[in-house]
Each structure stands twice: as C-alpha cells, then as structure tokens.
Curated annotation (Swiss-Prot):
Gene responsible for this protein: IRGM
The protein's name in its UniProt record: Immunity-related GTPase family M protein
Species for this entry: Homo sapiens
Disease: Inflammatory bowel disease 19: A chronic, relapsing inflammation of the gastrointestinal tract with a complex etiology. It is subdivided into Crohn disease and ulcerative colitis phenotypes. Crohn disease may affect any part of the gastrointestinal tract from the mouth to the anus, but most frequently it involves the terminal ileum and colon. Bowel inflammation is transmural and discontinuous; it may contain granulomas or be associated with intestinal or perianal fistulas.
Processing after translation: Ubiquitinated via 'Lys-63'-linked polyubiquitination in a NOD2-dependent process. 'Lys-63'-linked polyubiquitination is required for interactions with the core autophagy factors.
Lineage: Eukaryota, Metazoa, Chordata, Craniata, Vertebrata
EC numbers: 3.6.5.-
Any one Gene Ontology BP term: cellular response to interferon-beta
InterPro entries (UniProt xref): G_IRG_dom, Immunity-related_GTPase-like, IRG, P-loop_NTPase
C-alpha cells in the first residue's frame, strides 16, 4: 500500500509526500519482527555462522555453543547486533534428533521462520527436504556453504570446485522438483 502512495506522490511531483511515505515505510519495516533459522545437518557450522553474522566470535558468552559433537541440543535465539528486529535461531541440526524429519519440522515449528540452509561437505537429502518444506510454505530460502576452505584445500581450481558444488546443489533440488527454473 505504501509503495502505491509513494508512486502516486512521485507521479504528482509531491516530493514532501514521497519522503513522508518512505519514512513511514522504513518505520514499519524496522519494527517488523524477522525470525531467521539456520537449518541443516548437525556439524554443518550453523552455530558458527550465527556468531559470524552477529560479529561475536565463537568463544564469547553471548555466542551459540560450538563443539565437535552436537553442540546445539534445543532451540536458542540470538538477536542480531545490526538489526534489533532480527532474531537468529539456532536449532538442533537435522540428523541429531531421533525423530523423523516430519516430526522434527513440527517440533522445531518451522512455520515460524525464514530460512538459511547451511551445508558443508555434501548437500544431503535432509537439505533437499528442508528446502521443499520452505517452498511448500511459500517461503524463500538461501543456501550457505560453510567450511569451504576445507573443500578448496584439495588443490583443484577453486572456480571449478565452486561450480561443481553449485551444480550438485541445483541437481539435487531439481530431482525433487524444488526451485524449478
């Protein structure tokens, strides 16, 4: 609605009204809560990614725990250091729970979040199913590949490896009819 007001005021040449409408829109957006979850398999670096987004480092008291073995046992929220309305959610990784993926999705209340899919080493069927769930909910998702330094340390050309990772992710998504182009 605000966009139409801005467009109309702009077409009418009413600059003060354009500015007023833009300011009002910014106020609304800055107060709108945004819940983002890092979703993926255990050990993919979701907690570390949250710390990086918050610029807190992984050893700070306010940081999610990071350990070699299943550090995240239950849902935890962390506020963004840059945007007060953004909450980053650290959930137990898929594969860490003893329940089915369907039960996991219900227990973790996936309908509450926007998604960042976190993967490393391989793009698993759990990632594909999480992406399918997000798409079925009408939500967009992003895929972040972590621990890339380890993947690129094999000596092959980085550009080739990055392209292979991208193609593998797209191929797996398209097999399950997720994000068809």
């Amino acid at each position: 609605m605000e966009a139409m007001n801005v467009e109309k005021a702009s077409a009418d040449g009413n600059l003060p009204e354009v500015i007023s409408n833009i300011k009002e829109t910014l106020k609304i957006v800055s107060r709108t809560p945004v819940n983002i979850t890092m979703a993926g398999d255990s050990g993919n670096g979701m907690s570390t990614f949250i710390s990086a987004l918050r610029n807190t480092g992984h050893e700070g008291k306010a940081s999610p725990p990071t350990e070699l073995v299943k550090a995240t046992q239950r849902c935890a929220s962390y506020f963004s250091s840059h945007f007060s309305n953004v909450v980053l959610w650290d959930l137990p990784g898929t594969g860490s729970a003893t329940t089915t993926l369907e039960n996991y999705l219900m227990e973790m209340q996936f309908n509450r979040y926007d998604f960042i899919m976190v993967a490393s080493a391989q793009f698993s069927m759990n990632h594909v199913m999480l992406a399918k769930t997000a798409e079925d909910m009408g939500k967009k998702f992003y895929i972040v590949w972590t621990k890339l330094d380890m993947d690129l340390s094999t000596g092959a050309l980085p550009e080739v490896q990055l392209l292979q990772i991208r193609e593998n992710v797209l191929e797996n998504l398209q097999k399950e009819r997720v994000c068809e182009y």
